[in-house]
Amino acid sequence: MQLLLIHSDFIEFEAKKPTKFAEEVPEEARSGRLDEALCAFIAVEKFDEDDPDAVVAQAAGEIEEVAKRVKAERIMLYPYAHLSSALSSPETAVRVLRDLESTLKSSFEVARAPFGWYKSFTIRCKGHPLSELSRSIRIGEGEVVSQALKSEAKAVSHWRIMKKGGEMVPPEEFDFRGHERLEKFVRYEIEKSRAVDRIPPHVELMRRLELVDYEPGSDPGNMRYYPKGRLVKSLLESYVTDRALEMGAMEVETPVMYDMDHPTLKKYLDRFPARQYAIEADKKHLFLRFAACFGQFLMGHDMTFSYRSLPLRMFELTRYSFRREQRGELVGLRRLRAFTMPDMHTFCGDMSSAMEEFRKQYEASISVLRDAGLDLKDYEVAIRFTKDFYENNKTFIEGLVDIVDKPVLIEMWDERFFYFVLKFEFNFVDALDKASALSTVQIDVENAERYDIGYVDAEGNRQRPIILHCSPSGAIERLMYALLEKQAMIAANGGLPMLPTWLSPTQVRIIPVAERHHARAMEVAEQLNFRVDVDDRDETVGKKIRDAGREWVPYVAVVGDEELSTGLLTVTVRSESTSNQKIKMSVEELRARLQSETAGRPWRRLPLPVRLSERPKFV
């Protein structure tokens, strides 16, 4: 089912002419008007025929939640086939609409426009941030769905914007001028619509740059990585791993699949909001991991450690983790079914220690994203917590907002539905106004008990630790998506897109003017000892320079007769120049710039042949 929910000053309709699918309705039901109403435009879909009752229950819950949030006491149900291209049978649609009307009438004044009629309608939308929302109702796809995911769908959220200093206001009362990206993020979060309606710009870029592509021979959401893409991904993996180890984590490795009937794991599955891949093997029901929690917690159960080891951190870069995301939500690198997740868990002695570690990991995540190429202005912050936690720790929450020095989205629950009491995410909002979570940390108050994890305190007594879940960058693939989308927006505004020099597959391209300059070009490549290639193709210099620009090469150096005689290179620096502005520099000066821009970052060799004439084309 697809829902478009509009909070209106009024909505009125008149049924003009029946189609061959029109339901029979009395004359007085062929027109109607509601003032101060929430209008639900509805398309009942083919998928809904599998379980109409479940669809009605979930749709009623969504409509009721929005109606309460906007304080609407009247609801208009309006059949609107244009919301979907996969409509149900007319019989199912009428049944669902009637049952939905009956369900909502217990709490609201409800009117319903008849199904299958040509109708005219007039509506005046109120125009506040919550006045236009959409919902997609999906009841299963054959995957294993956790109890927590079902709870998440029912959880009632209290949304606020927290300003620096701690003031909280409802989104509809916040002045978003100067915070337009935050406004888009707020709408995306409240609407909860993850379906893909347009292809984001990074999909064209990841293919044109020969980084990543779809793999038609696999399940949707599983990608192939070309040499350049594998290089970028590998560098990010190494960097995030290095940062986790610098934080004091011990690197471990755990299995990718687990027994679904394991008593402890079964309980945890029902507390984690995710859809799992389920497989059968040797009469066992197995599932593929969606994080490193399972293996690290089982390892923690078997460990012996004391308060002297706290905070104790374990880290794994899971290649891969798996989530059976809904097919309509999969696109490019934004949302995948197989992904690489840096996953660190920290055992803390008490809540005070956990909160201090949370703050440190919050700040470390800001640093990780900054070094990868995303500044605070490039993403929005969401902080989510239970009401009890907030009441007891207001100053701490306000301090998190002060660190980022900008308004953040707050989601508060009256009760705890999940295993955590506090979490944050840094969310990237792309050119299509879709948001994706990157870095995150959660304070877990359940799983030490569930997995029987304990440490020995100073008095020799066994205690349960508080556990932090931390991904300093979020999934590596999603970080690549955010970097590409950021550059797409820069290009759309007239800028020159490029990856940071340390992530660029080719850091320097040498362009010989003629064949007699090839030897010097190769010599320069060897002297620089970075990721340097040589465009030895039989093309004009102008064409070679344009191609280097299309590949986002940070430094392009031309070698001709003048360069042979002076020993200097004519270099275009992409970050500060145009093709009409050249800089003369020596090999040593160029190498010094490269060293400065890549200091403290991982390094990999050029992933392709040095000579462009020897390279295969992947796309």
UniProtKB/Swiss-Prot annotation:
Subcellular location: Cytoplasm
Keywords annotated in UniProt: Aminoacyl-tRNA synthetase, ATP-binding, Cytoplasm, Ligase, Metal-binding, Nucleotide-binding, Protein biosynthesis, RNA-binding, tRNA-binding, Zinc
Cellular component, GO annotation: cytoplasm
InterPro entries listed in its UniProt record: aa-tRNA-synt_IIb, aa-tRNA-synth_II, aa-tRNA-synth_II/BPL/LPL, Anticodon-bd, Anticodon-bd_dom_sf, DTD-like_sf, Thr-tRNA-ligase_IIa, Threonyl-tRNA_syn_edit_dom_arc
Chain positions recorded as Zn(2+) binding sites: C293, H345, H469
Region described as Catalytic: 201-500
GO molecular function (one): threonine-tRNA ligase activity
Co-factor remark: Binds 1 zinc ion per subunit.
Cofactor(s) in the UniProt record: Zn(2+)
Domain of life: Archaea
GO BP annotations, alphabetical order: threonyl-tRNA aminoacylation
Main location: cytoplasm
Database matches in Pfam families: HGTP_anticodon, tRNA-synt_2b, tRNA-Thr_ED
EC id: 6.1.1.3
UniProt keyword annotation of tRNA processing present: no
Enzyme class of the recorded protein, top EC level: ligase
Signal peptide positions on this chain: none
Reaction it catalyzes: tRNA(Thr) + L-threonine + ATP = L-threonyl-tRNA(Thr) + AMP + diphosphate + H(+)
Family label: Belongs to the class-II aminoacyl-tRNA synthetase family.
Subunit structure as annotated in this protein's UniProt entry: Homodimer.
Comment on protein domains: The N-terminal domain is an archaea-specific tRNA-editing domain that hydrolyzes incorrectly charged L-seryl-tRNA(Thr). Catalysis of tRNA editing is performed by the charged tRNA itself.
Biological role: Catalyzes the attachment of threonine to tRNA(Thr) in a two-step reaction: L-threonine is first activated by ATP to form Thr-AMP and then transferred to the acceptor end of tRNA(Thr). Also edits incorrectly charged L-seryl-tRNA(Thr).
HAMAP family, sorted: Thr_tRNA_synth
Record protein name field: Threonine--tRNA ligase
Species for this entry: Methanothrix thermoacetophila (strain DSM 6194 / JCM 14653 / NBRC 101360 / PT)
